[in-house]
Amino acid sequence: QSGEPAFSATDCILAGTQKALKQVDAIDPNRLGLIGHSFGGFETGFTITQTDLFATAVAGSGIYDNASFYLYIQDEGDPAYFQYEENQLRIPQNLFLDYQGYLDNSALYHTSTMNTPLLLWSGKDDHHVDFNQTLDFYMGLKRLQKPVTMLLYAGMHHSAYKHFQQIDLCLKVEHWLDHYLKGVPAESWVK
C-alpha cells in the first residue's frame, strides 16, 4: 500500500505464512524463521517488531530508519529519496511533508515491541545501504536488552561477493537458524 511500505510488507508476510501453516501440516508453527536482505532486510526487521510469530529472524543490509536514510547519497552519487518517492519504498510524499509516516514505517522506532531473536549483518563498505543503518538498529535493540547479534564484515559491499565472506556468512546464518529452530547449542559468537 502506498505510504505504508513496512506495514504492507508485514501484512503480506503474515498472510502468506498463515496460508502456508493452514495448507502444510509438516510446518511447525513454533519453529518459523524469517530471513531477508536489502529490501527483504527492511521487511524482516520491521515485521518482527509487529509480531512474535517467528522464532528467529536474519536481516542483512536493510534500511531500519527511513528518516536518516532519505538523504543518504548512494554508490552512484544518487540521493536515496528517489527510492521512497518513485520506487521500491513507496512513500510518495517527501520526508518533510510526511515525517511521521517515515518514522512509523521504520523498524528502529518500534524496537520496544521486538522479542524475536535477530541476527543482523552488513558490509562495512556498503555504499548502497550504509552499514550504520544496521549499527543503529543493533544499538537500539541492545539498549533495550533485546535478543540481537550483529555481524559486520570489513571489505564487504551490499552483498557478499568475496568467496570467504559468502562461506562465513552462510555458515553463521545456518548455525543461527539451527540454534533457534532446532535447539543446537549456540557457538560463542551468538551470545
Residue spans for each PLM region:
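Active-site-proximal cap/loop segments of hydrolase catalytic domains
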Residues: 1-191
